[in-house]
Amino acid sequence: MMDPLKVLEKQSGFLRLLVYLSDKKEKALTEILDETDIPVHQLYSSIEKAKELNLIKTRTDSRKYPPRNLVSLTAKGKRFSKKLEELIRILEKD
């Protein structure tokens, strides 16, 4: 049987990304890197995983130079991140 804490540790960048985006409308990748402690390689793999699960969407804003890569939660991602925040609150209670 897999240890749930080990699974969470491996997915910590993924989970932190979703919690971080939960109260944001849309964020640039550079802002996410500046405002979180998620390592760059972990951030990119977390974004790909979350996109595959339809939890986030990405787009490029070309109106500014240099173009900015933007990330936001999908409706499914918002529901997921709210549940995740509930679970975190349960863990923090004791």
Regions found by a protein language model. Give the residues of each.
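Short alpha-helical segments that sit at the start of domains
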Residues: M1-R16
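Short amphipathic alpha-helical elements of helix-turn-helix/winged-helix folds
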Residues: L17-K24
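Short, charged/polar surface micro-motifs in flexible loops or helix N-caps
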Residues: K24-K27, G77-R79
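Intrinsically disordered, low-complexity basic tails/linkers immediately adjacent to helix-turn-helix/homeobox/MYB/SANT
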Residues: K64-K78
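Amphipathic alpha-helical dimerization/coiled-coil segments
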Residues: A75, R79-D94
